[in-house]
Amino acid sequence: MAITNSLTDSDYGINSTTGTSSTTGSSSQDLQNSFLTLLVAQLKNQD
């Protein structure tokens, strides 16, 4: 199943227009969790 990523972290196969779960090694739940983790970290670090 092809997925489109919207984050910018190469560890999750991101910053490419298309990817598959087999090439990224991440499920959609993993991507959602990593996005939320990055979002919370960014919110905590803003001035």
Curated annotation (Swiss-Prot):
Residues 1-30 are annotated as: Disordered. The keyword Aminoacyl-tRNA synthetase does not apply. Residues 16-28 have a biased composition (Low complexity). GO terms for biological process: bacterial-type flagellum organization. InterPro entries: FlgD. Keywords: Bacterial flagellum biogenesis. Coiled coil: none annotated. Residues 1-15 have a biased composition (Polar residues). Belongs to the FlgD family. Required for flagellar hook formation. May act as a scaffolding protein. This is Basal-body rod modification protein FlgD. The lineage of its organism: Bacteria, Pseudomonadati, Pseudomonadota, Gammaproteobacteria, Enterobacterales.
